[in-house]
């Protein structure tokens, strides 16, 4: 059985990807080859579920809402530009253990009731079973050391849906430029809480956004990793409804401590 699962994961042929719960590029463009070498494709068994970010050869950061359950077998692909094609640059690694943030409310994963919710602390660390090889196509990115600046131009990337109203996944990794906005711009359009551990980013005129399947992927502002995709509007890219990203400067200590305690 495990051989079959591995074969399916390695071949990437006919993967029936489905958007994860509340997963969140619309209006973007094909990323330049190997321009996002820290971008990771996260799978549960042979199903693509989320994006991720390589922090060092042993650790990947993604969103907590990408969590399945305690017995889920995660694996990742690094160094990929095309999700459904074999590439010489690609590396496959199994995940030995997952670490969702302890303060993320896991009951949200099974709660579809339309009422105000707090989706704070939406991040999860994945410990790789063996280190990634650092190459031109696979490189880690550092955590932020200072607050992001409002108005910054940010780059989000992912293999999420490229259409706002239906699940249409691309083969090529997509990039989109969006603006870092005051959190107040995200409080009005949403029922859910927007807290100080979140970032608000997008285009107030709409049309550019992360979307279903982009969750856990990086938000890089002024060349610095400042967030990972968390949640946003339905449909994606709505005017006056920017998306929400986990604010990583608020979690740098937890990330570093977790990695240090689990070498």
Swiss-Prot record:
Glycans are attached at residues 69, 105, 185. The active site is at residues 65, 122, 215. Its EC number is 3.4.21.35. Residues 25-260 form the Peptidase S1 domain. It holds the Pfam family Trypsin. Residues 1-17 form the signal peptide. InterPro entries: Peptidase_S1_PA (IPR009003), Peptidase_S1_PA_chymotrypsin (IPR043504), Peptidase_S1A (IPR001314), Trypsin_dom (IPR001254), TRYPSIN_HIS (IPR018114), TRYPSIN_SER (IPR033116). Keywords: Disulfide bond, Glycoprotein, Hydrolase, Protease, Serine protease, Signal, Zymogen. One of its GO terms (molecular function) is serine-type endopeptidase activity. Residues 18-24 form a propeptide. It catalyses: Preferential cleavage of Arg-|-Xaa bonds in small molecule substrates. Highly selective action to release kallidin (lysyl-bradykinin) from kininogen involves hydrolysis of Met-|-Xaa or Leu-|-Xaa. It is an enzyme of class 3 (hydrolase). GO terms for biological process: proteolysis. Disulfide bonds join 31-175, 50-66, 154-221, 186-200, 211-236. Belongs to the peptidase S1 family. Kallikrein subfamily. Glandular kallikreins cleave Met-Lys and Arg-Ser bonds in kininogen to release Lys-bradykinin. This is Kallikrein 1-related peptidase b24. The gene is Klk1b24.
